[in-house]
């Protein structure tokens, strides 16, 4: 039988609002998509075809599973947010760690996602500062208003442009038939051979960079937003699982485009990257170039709309989640407008500070992206463990989340050691990981 969903039992007209299924799918897809499947896939494609394997396997076995369960668990617990679920299944200390973690992560997401669209738009017209201010104004509004007012109205349009962009690129790929590096030739780290300045190792770094195409903890903070709007539990699978798979597809498309861009275009990508100064160094540039070259003016505009809409739409729901999490931790009722404002102000102040630092620092975007990627994956580890505990308690087949949980634990801790702030001793890592996994298991 169908258990009544939180959308009906706890309807408050602000966050708990029943909505039609197709709308929820579109919103969930956009929330989780962000620029992950685009920028992440592009940056990840530098590693060569190994990126494909990770996107496909990670998406099916880890990512979609993770999204589905976090959404359903939330529905079973009155639309509880992530820290609350962690508290229920892993205990008090992890919950408090998670509270801080979630909010920090969400603010970082918001910040990264103010910055990247502003770059692209600023490149087209006006300065990026103007755009940053406009995007922020929109965020403040979207974070405050009831969910069906703004988010339910404009998302479906954005979602369409994102999907359109993916389809258009597929068509172009089929017309052009670019020569791609073959899988078995390039399982190593291709970028290293071609571009001496590129130093990341494939093991932890690839899995950190391609977060949203494969698995991402951020999604678990987004699923509850939609779990509060679903009309029936039967819709859980197509919506939570389906939107993740859709996202995996988008990531594959962009990875393919980027492979072509880095390894087979008339002037190889990294030379173009080196030639272009300033704004052009990071992923947004690949996007703008490809869209304008391949899709002409109209297509370019539509595609850029998609690339811009995705981060903006993830940013506002990120701030929205942050607001809800802080509020539930402080037990603040979200009905009165003033309460919503109290929670929002500090959140936005921190974000603006981050932005200022990021803009003044040439490599700022890539640094924040790496931190964001890492905290993202670490978040997914927590969630996977919580789901595993749930399944064990219910005597369900818990291996399906146990394996990804172990794997991601490995990736995250290794990354801590290997990244620039630390030392990269291979043997150390291996046995540290061994100990770590044993302790946990």
Predicted regions and their residues:
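Hydrophobic alpha-helical segments and their helix-loop junctions in multi-pass secondary transporters
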Residues: 110-114, 118-133, 141-143, 163-193, ...
């Amino acid at each position: 039988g169908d258990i009544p969903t939180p959308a009906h039992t706890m309807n408050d007209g602000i966050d708990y609002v029943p909505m039609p299924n197709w709308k929820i799918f579109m919103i969930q897809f956009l929330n989780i998509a962000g620029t992950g499947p685009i920028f992440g896939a592009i940056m990840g494609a530098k590693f060569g075809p190994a990126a494909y394997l990770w996107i496909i396997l990670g998406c099916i076995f880890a990512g979609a599973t993770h999204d589905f369960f976090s959404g359903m668990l939330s529905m079973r617990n009155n639309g509880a947010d992530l820290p609350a679920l962690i508290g229920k299944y892993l205990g008090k200390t992890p919950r408090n760690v998670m509270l801080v973690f979630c909010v920090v992560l969400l603010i970082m997401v918001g910040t990264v996602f103010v910055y990247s669209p502003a770059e692209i738009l600023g490149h087209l017209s006006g300065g990026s500062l103007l755009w940053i201010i406009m995007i922020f104004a929109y965020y403040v509004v979207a974070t405050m208003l009831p969910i069906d007012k703004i988010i339910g109205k404009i998302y479906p349009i954005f979602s369409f442009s994102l999907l359109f962009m993916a389809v258009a690129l597929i068509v172009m790929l089929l017309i052009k038939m670019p020569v791609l590096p073959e899988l078995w030739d390039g399982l190593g780290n291709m970028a290293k051979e071609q571009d001496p300045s590129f130093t990341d190792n494939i093991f932890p770094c690839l899995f950190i960079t391609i977060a949203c195409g494969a698995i991402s903890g951020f999604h678990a903070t987004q699923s509850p937003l939609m779990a509060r709007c679903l009309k029936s539990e039967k819709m859980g699978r197509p919506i939570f699982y389906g939107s993740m798979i859709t996202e995996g597809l988008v990531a594959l498309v962009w990875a393919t485009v980027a492979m072509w861009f880095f390894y087979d275009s008339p002037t190889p990508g990294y030379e173009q990257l080196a030639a272009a100064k300033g704004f052009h160094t990071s992923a947004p540039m690949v996007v703008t170039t490809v869209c304008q070259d391949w899709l002409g003016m109209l297509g370019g505009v539509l595609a850029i709309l998609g690339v811009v809409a995705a981060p903006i739409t993830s940013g506002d729901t990120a701030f929205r989640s942050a607001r809800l999490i802080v509020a539930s931790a402080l037990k603040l009722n979200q009905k009165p407008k003033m309460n919503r404002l109290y929670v929002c102000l500090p959140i936005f102040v921190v974000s603006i500070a981050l932005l200022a630092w990021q803009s003044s620092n040439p490599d700022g975007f890539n640094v924040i992206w790496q931190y964001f990627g890492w905290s993202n994956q670490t978040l997914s580890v927590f969630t996977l463990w919580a789901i595993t505990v749930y399944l064990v308690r219910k005597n369900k087949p818990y291996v399906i989340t146990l394996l990804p949980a172990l794997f991601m634990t490995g990736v995250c801790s290794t990354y801590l050691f290997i990244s620039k702030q630390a030392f990269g001793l291979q043997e150390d890592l291996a046995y540290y990981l061994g100990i770590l996994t044993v302790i946990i298991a």
